[in-house]
Amino acid sequence: MNAADISRAPPGYLEVAWIADTCKLLMGLGWTTNYAGMIYKSLKDRTYGMALMPLCCNFAWELTYAVIYPFGSRQDKFTHYFGLMLNCGVMYTAVKNAEREWTHAPLVRRNLPFIFIICIAAWTTAHLALALQIGPSHAQAFSAYGCQLLLSVGALCQLLSRGSSRGASYFLW
């Protein structure tokens, strides 16, 4: 996620740019590991590992910056496409297993496909609106922070509402 053109960066930054690149690589490896672990744990526990609202927000972010506003190096584009593909796996486990988690709320349970579609469309619209307001490169970074905050809060809410750690593990946390 480059929110600025580093070709115009001061020479002092260019000398240590490898640190930022290494951090981006580690972040990509972390997300890849987390997505793969989440898919595995979700299939094993027959539930989903990421709360629905953050999942839809994150999926919309991946869709927005892999398909609608792809930019950066080939490595950046590949990372976004790969993240989107893994996120499809996370989304699959959620769609497949969500009904089991919503037996206490029949209205939600009956409307889960509609809820997924509306949430993804709404979050995609939000990401696009932010990109139009401040530009895609800045919006990519800022909306990622928002997604991460929503993901953290959603994980805690999911843990509290389930009353157990089904779908989660120390590895994923």
From Swiss-Prot:
Location within or outside the cell: Membrane
Cellular component aspect of the GO annotation: membrane
Membrane topology: Multi-pass membrane protein
Enzyme class: lyase
GO molecular function, one term: lyase activity
Pathway per the UniProt entry: Secondary metabolite biosynthesis; terpenoid biosynthesis
Induction cue: The subglutinol cluster is highly expressed when mycelia and hyphae are transferred to fresh media for a 3 hour induction period, remaining expressed under conditions of heat shock. The cluster is repressed in cultures reaching stationary phase or in early germinating cultures, as well as under conditions of UV, salt and oxidative stress.
Transmembrane segments: 11-31, 51-71, 112-132, 141-161
GO biological process, one term: terpenoid biosynthetic process
Record flagged with keyword Lyase: yes
Enzyme Commission number(s): 4.2.3.-
InterPro entries per the UniProt record, alphabetical: PaxB-like
Keyword vocabulary terms for this entry: Lyase, Membrane, Transmembrane, Transmembrane helix
Pfam family, any one: Pyr4-TMTC
Disulfide bonds: none
Function recorded in the entry: Terpene cyclase; part of the gene cluster that mediates the biosynthesis of the immunosuppressants subglutinols, meroterpenoids consisting of an alpha-pyrone (4-hydroxy-5,6-dimethyl-2-pyrone) moiety attached to a decalin core fused to a five-membered cyclic ether carrying a prenylside chain. The first step of the pathway is the synthesis of the alpha-pyrone moiety by the polyketide synthase subA via condensation of one acetyl-CoA starter unit with 3 malonyl-CoA units and 2 methylations.
Family, similarity comment: Belongs to the paxB family.
Name the UniProt record assigns to this protein: Terpene cyclase subB
Species this chain originates from: Metarhizium robertsii (strain ARSEF 23 / ATCC MYA-3075)
Name of the gene encoding the protein in the UniProt record: subB
